[in-house]
């Protein structure tokens, strides 16, 4: 990928990687093709049920031949300009990995953790936090994230691993594969940053119901809410047969 910043330009070898299921979202696929094609990047995918294993196998294919990897989730929405902006920030900032802001599905939180601070201690940042274009974070996501291959090669394998909690369950207090990666990433001497002024979309499936009492004539709910709430629509839905 040819990166231009002001009067300077450099060729950066970028590998776009995806861990994917057999079926996916066409909106995302067309988004990816339109975002990567202008930069001459063809995505590499590995299909399987286990996110971490698939992504590690993708990384292993390119870690010795490319400068950076761009990890992409199959529900992320972004543009060619997003890719260009993130790579420019990565190269200029000196960080070893850089993620954009992305909101968690079915939640009101952005997916990153402040260094040394648990979500129980703090869940917001001040306005002046955004004045610095890249801020250090402890963990992030893989939705549209650049990682230097030199940083990956510092890490021992496995790069991804799910760890149960002290009770041997995954119902809280456990470590998911993506968080395991970022913790090992930092332990290997690497720095992860978040682009405070660059965001990507997160596609999520909603259920829309007709309504006679709500302005606009409809009410919506997340699919998870429907299944976890006794298969009931939200208040204001009209005509539902229980």
Which positions does each model-derived feature cover?
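Short beta-strand-to-loop acidic/aromatic patch adjacent to the donor-nucleotide binding site
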Residues: 66-77
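Residue-level detector of anion-binding/catalytic polar loops
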Residues: 42, 75, 96, 191-193
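Conserved catalytic core of nucleotide-sugar-dependent glycosyltransferases
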Residues: 59, 79-165
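Polar low-complexity intrinsically disordered regions
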Residues: 15-19, 33-35, 75, 87-89, ...
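Short, high-confidence coil segments that cap the C-terminus of an alpha-helix
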Residues: 66-67, 93-95, 190
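C-terminal catalytic/acceptor-binding lobe
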Residues: 2-15, 157-242
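Active-site nucleotide-sugar/metal-binding loop of Leloir-type enzymes
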Residues: 56-68
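N-proximal low-complexity "stem/linker" segments adjacent to membrane-targeting elements
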Residues: 1-49, 53
